[in-house]
Amino acid sequence: MDRLTLDQVKSVLERLPVRSVNLGTGENGMHPDFRAILAYLRTQPVKLTITSNGHSIAVLEDNELRAFHDIEFSLDYPTQDEQDMQRGAGNWALIHQQAARCVKLGVPVTIIAVMMKSNYLRLAEVARVAKEFGAPLRVNVYQSVRSDTYALSYGEYWEGFKRLLAETDVIAISEPLVRAMAGLPPLEGGCGVSTVRVTPRATTQPCVYWPGGGEPLSGLMASGIGILSSASFEQARAVPAACQACEFRDTCHGGCAGRRRLQGALLEPDYYCPIMRGERPRLEVRMAASRDLPKLSSCCTTVVMAR
């Protein structure tokens, strides 16, 4: 099984000017050195977050949980039967138990859902579940990393966001097309600019959804912040030629680079771009109070709060 070692984690933080660290990609609680790595990270001047199905939170002591700036729980459906069918029996209860525990400890909670064909019209309902814990809902669009079974059609993508934004208040949007159509200004940072993904295979990628194995960690050790000038990071920042004259260029940058790369169309506009189809949907948004959410700048995402 691929796993980063504690020494590799230390090396990454020594070579990069890190402000925040998210522990994602699978259940970190299954790593034999999870607690040792967490103990080290707690000594560093970084904002620490974790994404979990509940297991990695359940194995930690209360004092360890208090080290986190935010704890994310993966919940894709608003009912127990649907969630347990997708994630395994007992997952709904585990998430509710551990989210309630975090709230009791004063640790901020976020619910993270993937917008996909099976739930795209029901995410406002998931947001209402999140609100039971005083938590926002963070939404990532399904990316066809292994299969396109759950991938949204063009119409489903836009209908999903219209429904979601009609029933929730927006904390932040970094999903490029949605941000542009909501009339929000350009956002600094993002994939290929200010984030580095270090995989369990000890490789680096500019985006969590970037296809391929990634570049060996030795490249980061040699170049440090210079990793941002490597080929894959430059590709993640590339704006398609067809988008150069678009009025939304500075906000959208051609859409999600990871999605374009996955679809073998890095140099083409995002599949979900309405402008290329001669359309211009306007998304009406009502803003909520801002929150300090480090994950906002590390992926194309949307954060909302149920009304």
Show where each model-derived region lies:
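Residue-level signal for well-ordered alpha-helical positions
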Residues: 53, 63, 85-86, 210, ...
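Radical SAM enzyme [4Fe-4S]-AdoMet core and its adjacent flexible, acidic
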Residues: 4, 14, 35-39, 47, ...
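Conserved beta-strand edge residues that scaffold enzyme active sites
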Residues: 27, 55-56, 116-117, 143-144, ...
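Short glycine-rich, flexible loops that bind phosphorylated cofactors or substrates
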Residues: 30, 58, 80-81, 255
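Short secondary-structure boundary/hinge segments and terminal tails
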Residues: 31, 58-60, 120, 147-148, ...
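Accessory C-terminal segments flanking Radical SAM cores
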Residues: 174-280
